[in-house]
Amino acid sequence: KVAVIISSFAQEMAISIKQHNGFALKFVGDAVIGYFIDVSTLLAADKAIECAKNMIAIMEKGINPILNEYDYPPLYIKVGLDFGMNMIVRYGSDKQKSHVDILGPAMNMAAKVQNMAKPQQILIGADVYKKIHPATQKNFKKKTLSEARWKYRYRDSGKLYPIYEYVS
């Protein structure tokens, strides 16, 4: 039964990513890693935000009510997003059997941002915040974190890299 739940979760998250013009790169345990590219970086950032909101709605309105019917505990997701250059890498020479991965500072930062999120929370890095539409920016609040909890800095200035919380 647990395998069916995890499989259903992964399938729903992958569908949501695809519906928002993203790509589901891989599934790691109960985590889904997706990425968004577009002709316009602004559009890609907004699509990623919409996808994150949709994923939480899927959990709250789709998956968890079904789990509740069978007396299973609810599942919660934590979303972390960042923006920047990454590199897509293929491990192996056989196109059918090789593994594809995405590497780079933005992927690393997205994982760190996600690690700071609470269940059913969307957190984004400053580089995403700068790219999203001003109307969407109004739904985010800069998160105050102690340097003991959040140590990540801009490489060029050394200033603390801000993260923002979705509040609306």
Where are these regions (language model features)?
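Short alpha-helical functional segments enriched in proximate histidine and acidic residues
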Residues: 16, 58
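Intrinsically disordered, glycine/charged-rich C-terminal tails and inter-domain linkers
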Residues: 119-168
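Helical (often loop-to-helix) elements that flank the catalytic cores of nucleotide-handling enzymes
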Residues: 44-50
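Catalytic core of nucleotidyl cyclases, primarily class III adenylyl/guanylyl cyclases
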Residues: 20-44, 64-103
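Catalytic/regulatory signature loops of cyclic-dinucleotide turnover enzymes
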Residues: 82, 105-130
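Conserved long alpha-helical elements within nucleotide-processing catalytic cores of c-di-GMP signaling
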Residues: 1-11, 26
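Serine endopeptidase catalytic core focused on the charge-relay Asp
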Residues: 55
